[in-house]
């Protein structure tokens, strides 16, 4: 599997996990109802499936690396969905996390 395909899988996983969590948040905190919560739970389940498509056989490695994608993706989601404006420290932290993801997943072994 190419690095590009692996990165694409991480991006899809992030959409499902962050989107799912956001839908649950909207259903509970913003009182949008059970449909939103149910859609969020379904999206979170899809995230779990997408993670299994990564080429590495080690669950811990995949989830640890995905953590970096989750951090950066959450900031991007907040910008797009909620008008959040990250500061330079948010951006710096996200870049550090993405660097960590790249080392964990793609360093030669």
Curated annotation (Swiss-Prot):
The keyword Protease belongs to this UniProt entry's keyword annotation: no
Chief location category: membrane
One protein family per Pfam: UPF0060
Alphabetical keyword list: Cell membrane, Membrane, Transmembrane, Transmembrane helix
Topology relative to the membrane: Multi-pass membrane protein
Localization: Cell membrane
Domain of life: Bacteria
InterPro entries according to UniProt: UPF0060 (IPR003844)
Segments crossing the lipid bilayer: 7-27, 33-53, 62-82, 88-108
Listed GO CC annotations: plasma membrane
NCBIfam families from the UniProt entry: PRK02237.1 (NF002586)
HAMAP family: UPF0060 (MF_00010)
Family: Belongs to the UPF0060 family.
Protein's UniProt name: UPF0060 membrane protein RHA1_ro06609
